[in-house]
From Swiss-Prot:
Subunit structure, interactors included: Interacts with MOV10.
Residues of the Reverse transcriptase domain: 505-780
Role according to the record: Has reverse transcriptase activity required for target-primed reverse transcription of the LINE-1 element mRNA, a crucial step in LINE-1 retrotransposition. Selectively binds and reversely transcribes RNA with a poly(A) tail consisting of at least 20 adenosines. Also has endonuclease activity that allows the introduction of nicks in the chromosomal target DNA. Cleaves DNA in AT-rich regions between a 5' stretch of purines and a 3' stretch of pyrimidines, corresponding to the sites of LINE-1 integration in the genome.
Record protein name field: LINE-1 retrotransposable element ORF2 protein
Domain topic, free-text comment: The FADD motif is located within the catalytic core and is essential for reverse transcriptase activity. The C-terminal segment (CTS) binds to RNA with high affinity in the nanomolar range but without apparent sequence specificity. The size and flexibility of the betaB6-betaB5 hairpin loop at residues 198-212 are crucial for activity. Variation of the loop sequence results in an altered DNA nicking profile including novel sites.
InterPro entries: DNA/RNA_pol_sf, Endo/exonu/phosph_ase_sf, Endo/exonuclease/phosphatase, RT_dom
E.C. code: 2.7.7.49, 3.1.21.-
PROSITE patterns cross-referenced by the UniProt entry: RT_POL
Residues binding dTTP: 526, 529, 538, 607-612, 666, 709, 741, 744
Signal peptide as annotated in the record: none
Gene field: Pol
Motif FADD motif mapped to chain: 707-710
List of residues binding Mg(2+) 1: 607, 709-710
Residues annotated as domain DUF1725: 1247-1266
């Protein structure tokens, strides 16, 4: 081969352009190989010729990292050119010119404010030079000094461009003359005037030539650094690379090492790393080395080892190809200088061998990717999430407003502007320590007791470390050190002892490893905000995983005691508290104000400026000390905040580290709790300040609601209260750094005094709105009557708009059901949860109709709605019932009533005249009999109505049950001494079920009998009279139902809505025709209950892939249309089989009885006999998964796969007059086999795969010819042959 220019060292730092004749891209394998080749070359621009793509197939060309693609394609699979532009740059096209037949495309635009035009040409074989000449003349107006002309010209431009001596023909001479007239020159020949360099080898002629060219304007040659020929094995052409003088950015792109998690699946790698850890500690763990330094050194050491192992593994994988490629280059070089027929044949053979090896490797990678989709497609998982959310573009900051307010595109100035902004943001450190102390003296914070402090300070245990490591989320970006969560989980047995010692040293010495202070900040633009303003970017911080492990342990500890410090007004990150508490609270306050005649109130939603980023570390430490936190726990927090730093990453480059002198650490599990504790100081100050008057609702004064930095303040006498509130916030800000954004803070003002309203508007910096305020994702309205319009009408509109956007998504009806569950249901549940007011039935009917249209893609439903709502008969694929979910959410308030929680102010203030303890006597209690709700009750009356209705439908007494509390109103009215009830609750239990009724009264356990002997005799007589009464015994002697358990047993409200929904579905069940029963009628069988259960289980367990399960679900649920069914729909008399057999086309006939289908089923049973599996030829087995009792259990998985593969092939030719072929069936089985193999490897379930497939693999391979194996790439994945 001719001499190839050596790749320039560091050329990836420069703009580069590659031109390549790809010789067809209709093969997916070829497209994958092109993607790999491009990633290795990493050009800024890639110009492809001969893509052979038709205009309708343009979407085939997609390359990760080069999303901007300009194409010119014809109507046939010939010609075709494309220009791909790297995501690393911002190219702004102004002019695009295309050839209709796909022979050229021209783009003109700007890059870094410089003009650039690229003309990509593929010349036809006939009269190529004439075509090039005519094209240049035609586009002369667009050719300028900044123009680059590239492509396959199909002709040499110089006699040196051929390996044999021949003069240029007349057309080529004319072309070169036109080029001279236009001041164009061959850039390669300019750089290498005497070098022989070739891009094309003609195998039939055994000749080399350079027919691929890059042409530039003579006056623009100073723009280019070099040009080189790039070897490419996936085409019969080599590529050309042109390197510009322009840097991609002003500075070296930052390489950040990240662990390749696939290494962790390699047994040799795992064993090697375990040994390295052990050896490292043996040699380096001594008294001379501090543990923080030892830990950081070990990470650096392991990083080096992993890099070496990765390189070694890659080298092993590519050794064979590299050897062949080196040999090929040597042969081509010899052949170019002295042609020889035998060598030419060897070159052709060698190229074929390399292509075969690379193709096989590409197929393997494709299959690995396909197996991932095979497992996850149509499930509630990443593929569906990506479909609904759309593609998120790579974020490039190409322009920004500098400190003067001017837009700059200079990369260096962009970096300086961003770094300066965040340096100012994070480096504001207040030194007024005395003022901080004075503020904290004035507003005392609650303290933890000694037991709580002792728990915080107890030594960190290995169990805590292991629990946190196990809970780490996987498949997430690692921190600056590159070690992922999977690394810690894989080597936890080796790392936990080291981390335990490290954390002990930190507890004692208060010094962290230096890597614990590091973080990388990535900037994400806020949606629908001006991206040229730096404040409109959201900084996302990545900490190292080891630092997160320590911080998570500290967070877990403080979480247990946070309620002792934080008032129930704060609900963010507090166990047992939810965001909708504050929404309901705000609505109840608004409702209360609306009912008042004399109004003089204000509700203010405060917006804090960068609240998390401005918290002062000295103040935070002082607050923690005042809260009683001290000792090792406090020392560790001090260490965490002693010298944190962060590198901001802009366009792939890490900027110089900035110190983080203020703000809680982003991405740190401990930060939310520290922020809450600091903000509690302000909340406490607002509560204590008498001049800030809250709103008195009955016996409750309501002043404030908080969730993280979202704060709402409720005040009366707004004229004076707002002044005091602002003064207090300013005083707080002076010691904490907290600042209110007055322009974004909004308020409702309630007053009938117009003069007072005018004064308040003039003196208050907040925006006083008349209609609504956005708060925690819902719209608070000034009057509660507008809640439905502003929240639920808008929700309906949002859902319908989402469904409209998703109508063309490429997924099946099952995938669409899961999209509804994944994207629509959470949105609806959140809104129902926040505002559970009465909603008209029409709202749900409209939504159900829109969802049904979406699921069936505007076609008539194939499966009854009632079937899809029954998890048992639909194979686990259920359509969510929004109305039932809404009812479940409305009813769930009853759970909080039963708990009688003192923290639920949101509930108590709805009816201020009601005794708060009444709520605790409503659920399964006597208080429910006399409760009277006000007509204007927003939430509680509606909850009570639905609760009673549900209990009656379930035939459960809502007043007295086994779950009635020992402290119920029934027993309270007996005037039992409080100490008696307390003793029973502590020693026996809190319900009548625990205490026992009738003969079991206080004698179910030895402890109960002991308590009975200690109770006052009068109390015992009273309790006996109630517990042994006939009515009590009749209603409580049974065990509690699932419905009763939901409201009385769980200590947490986690999963509450789902549990209520499940129980409501049982009573809301609408009877539908069971499809398995219909199959029984058609098969002349009556299935037993066990067979029904077998079929239902088969629907869920026949495969882990939903693609495979879908076919079984469709078959069992009778999804497919038949001639008989269509004849009824169209009211026609023709119900004959579509395959042309002349028989009546029932569903059973189409699947099984048709004489054109029977040969396939004969082949299936022939395979079964070869596997030594004896099954009767009963259609219920392959169609429904109902096996005979004596069927071999261990072989059912194998059989099911064979049957479902056959169903796929029969369905594929459903209306075609042909017999489904055995070859197609074998190919389908092989596809499933391949997908399950890669899935088993990934999940470490190879033995299970082997048991299922080993015998069947051999039979399949014995049934196919050698040519079929080659054409379908069918080789044993188990043995490798």
């Amino acid at each position: 081969m001719p001499t190839l220019t050596t790749k320039i060292k560091g050329s990836n730092n420069y703009f580069s352009l590659i031109s390549l004749n790809i010789n067809g891209l209709n093969s997916p394998i070829k497209r994958h190989r092109l993607t790999d080749w491009l990633h290795k070359q990493d050009p800024t621009f890639c110009c492809l010729q001969e893509t052979h793509l038709r205009e309708k197939d343009r979407h085939y060309l997609r390359v990760k990292g080069w999303k901007t693609i300009f194409q010119a394609n014809g109507l046939k699979k010939q010609a075709g050119v494309a220009i791909l532009i790297s995501d690393k740059i911002d190219f702004q096209p102004k002019v695009i010119k295309k050839d209709k037949e796909g022979h050229f495309i021209l783009i003109k635009g700007k890059i870094l404010q410089e003009e650039l035009s690229i003309l990509n040409i593929y010349a036809p074989n006939a009269r190529a030079a004439t075509f090039i000449r005519d094209t240049l003349v035609k586009l002369k107006a667009y050719i300028a000094p900044h123009t680059i002309i590239v492509g396959d010209f199909n002709t040499p431009l110089s006699s040196k461009d051929r390996s044999w001596k021949q003069k240029l023909n007349r057309d080529t001479v004319k072309l070169t003359e036109v080029m001279k007239q236009m001041d164009l020159t061959d850039i390669y020949r300019t750089f290498y005037p005497k070098t022989k360099g070739y891009t094309f080898f003609s195998a039939p002629h055994g000749t080399f030539s350079k027919i691929d060219h890059i042409i530039g304007h003579k006056t623009g040659l100073n723009r280019y650094k070099n040009i080189e020929i790039v070897p490419c094995i996936l085409s019969d052409h080599h590529g050309l690379r042109l390197i510009f003088n322009n840097n991609i950015n002003n500075g070296k792109p930052t390489f950040t090492w990240k662990l390749n998690n696939t290494l962790l699946n390699d047994t040799l790698v795992k064993e090697g790393i375990k040994k390295e850890i052990k050896d490292f500690l043996e040699f380096n763990e001594n008294e001379a080395t501090t543990y923080p330094n030892l830990w950081d050194t070990m990470k650096a050491f392991l990083r080096g080892k992993l890099i070496a192992l990765s390189a070694s593994k890659k080298k092993r994988e590519t050794a064979h190809t590299s050897s062949l490629t080196t040999h090929l280059k040597a042969l081509e070089k010899k052949e170019a200088n002295s042609p020889k027929r035998s060598r030419r044949q060897e070159i052709i053979k060698l190229r074929g061998e390399i292509n075969q090896v690379e193709t096989r490797r590409t197929i393997q990678r494709i299959n690995q990717t396909r197996s991932w989709f095979f497992e996850k497609i149509n499930k509630i998982d990443k593929p569906l999430a990506r479909l609904t959310k759309g593609h998120r573009d790579k974020i490039l900051i190409n322009k920004i407003r500098n400190e003067k307010g001017d837009i700059t595109t200079d990369p260096e100035e962009i970096q300086n502007t961003i770094r300066s902004f965040y340096k100012r943001l994070y480096s504001t450190k207040l030194e007024n320590l005395d003022e901080m102390d004075k503020f904290l003296d004035r507003y005392q914070v609650p303290k933890l007791n000694q037991d709580q402090v002792d728990h915080l300070n107890s030594p960190i245990s290995p169990k805590e470390i292991e629990a946190v490591i196990n809970s780490l989320p996987t498949k997430k970006s690692p921190g600056p050190d590159g070690f992922s969560a999977e690394f810690y989980q894989t080597f936890k047995e080796d790392l936990i002892p080291i981390l335990h010692k490290l954390f002990h040293k930190i507890e004692v010495e208060g010094t962290l490893p230096n890597s614990f202070y590091e973080a990388t900040i990535t900037l994400i633009p806020k949606p629908q905000k001006d991206p040229t303003k730096i404040e409109n970017f959201r900084p996302i911080s990545l900490m190292n995983i080891d630092a997160k492990i320590l911080n998570k342990i500290l967070a877990n500890r403080i979480q247990e005691h946070i309620k002792a410090i934080i008032h129930p007004d704060q609900v963010g990150f507090i166990p047992g508290m939810q965001g909708w508490f504050n929404i309901r609270k705000s609505i109840n306050v608004i409702h209360y104000i609306n009912k008042l005649k004399d109004k003089n109130h204000m509700i203010i939603s405060l917006d804090a400026e960068k609240a998390f980023d401005k918290i002062q570390h000295p103040f935070m430490i002082k607050v923690l000390e005042r809260s009683g936190i001290q000792g090792p726990y406090l020392n560790m927090i001090k260490a965490i905040y002693s010298k944190p730093v962060a590198n901001i990453k802009v366009n792939g480059e890490k900027l110089e580290a900035i110190p983080l002198k203020s703000g809680t650490r982003q991405g740190c599990p401990l930060s939310p709790y520290l922020f809450n504790i600091v903000l509690e100081v302000l909340a406490r100050a607002i509560r204590q300040q008498k001049e800030i008057k809250g709103i008195q609702i009955g016996k409750e004064e309501v002043k404030i609601s908080l969730l993280a930095d979202d704060m709402i303040v409720y005040i009366s006498d707004p004229k004076n209260s707002t002044r005091e509130l602002l003064n207090l916030i300013n005083s707080f800000g002076e010691v904490v750094g907290y600042k209110i954004n007055s322009n974004k803070s909004m308020a409702f003002l309630y007053t009938k005094n117009k003069q007072a309203e005018k004064e308040i508007r003039e003196t208050t910096p907040f925006s006083i709105v008349t209609n609504n305020i956005k708060y925690l994702g819902v719209t608070l309205t000034k009057e509660v009557k507008d809640l439905y319009d502003k929240n639920f009408k808008s929700l309906k509109k949002e859902i319908k708009e989402d469904l409209r956007r998703w109508k063309d998504l490429p997924c099946s009806w099952i995938g669409r059901i899961n999209i509804v569950k994944m994207a629509i249901l959470p949105k609806a549940i959140y809104r129902f949860n926040a505002i559970p007011i009465k909603i008209p039935t029409q709202f749900f009917n409209e939504l159900e109709g829109a969802i049904c249209k979406f699921v069936w893609n505007n076609k008539k439903p194939r499966i009854a709605k009632s079937l899809l709502k029954d998890k048992r008969t639909s194979g686990g694929i259920t359509m969510p019932d929004l109305k039932l979910y809404y009812r479940a959410i409305v009813i769930k308030t009853a759970w909080y009533w039963y708990r009688d929680r003192q923290v639920d102010q949101w509930n108590r203030i709805e009816d201020p005249e009601m005794n708060p303890h009444t709520y605790g006597h409503l659920i399964f209690d006597k208080g429910a009999k006399t409760i009277q709700w006000k007509k204007d009750s927003i939430f509680n009356n509606w909850c009570w109505h639905n609760w009673l209705l549900s209990c009656r439908r379930m035939r459960i007494d809502p007043y007295l049950s086994p779950c009635t509390k020992v402290k119920s109103k029934w027993i309270k009215e007996l005037h039992i001494k409080p100490e008696t009830l307390k003793l029973i609750e502590e020693k026996v239990g809190k319900s009548l079920e625990d205490m026992g009724t009738g003969e079991k009264f206080l004698n179910r356990t030895a402890m109960a009998c002991a308590v009975r002997s200690r109770i006052d005799k009068w109390d015992l007589m009273k309790l006996q009279s109630f517990c042994k009464a006939k009515d009590t015994v009749n209603k409580t002697k049974r065990p509690p139902t699932d419905w009763e358990r939901i409201f009385t047993y769980p200590k947490s409200d986690r999963g509450l809505i789902s549990n209520i929904y499940k129980e409501l579905k049982k009573v809301d069940f609408r009877k539908s025709n069971n499809p398995i029963k219909k199959w029984g009628s058609e098969l002349n069988k009556e299935f037993s209950p066990e067979e029904y259960r077998m079929a239902e289980k088969h629907l869920k367990k026949c495969s882990t892939s939903l693609i495979i399960r879908e076919m079984q679900i469709k078959t069992t649920l009778r999804f497919h249309l038949t001639p008989v069914r269509m004849a009824k729909i169209k009211n026609s008399g023709d119900s004959r089989c579509w395959r042309g057999c002349g028989e009546r086309g029932t569903l059973l006939h189409c699947w099984w009885e048709c004489r054109l289908v029977q040969p396939l089923w004969k082949s299936v049973w022939r395979f079964l006999r070869k596997l030594d599996i004896v099954l009767p030829e009963d259609p219920a087995i392959p169609l429904l998964g109902i096996y005979p009792e004596d069927a071999p259990t261990g072989k059912k998985d194998t059989c099911s796969t064979m049957f479902i593969a056959a169903l796929f092939i029969i369905a594929r030719s459903w209306k075609e007059p042909r017999c489904p072929s055995t070859e197609e069936w074998i190919q389908k089985m092989w596809y499933i086999y391949t997908m399950e193999y890669y899935s088993a490897i990934k999940k470490n379930e190879f033995m299970k795969f082997l048991a299922k497939w080993m015998d069947l693999e051999g039979i399949i391979l014995s049934e196919v010819t050698h040519s079929q194996r080659n054409s379908h790439n069918m080789y044993s994945l188990i043995s490798g042959y």
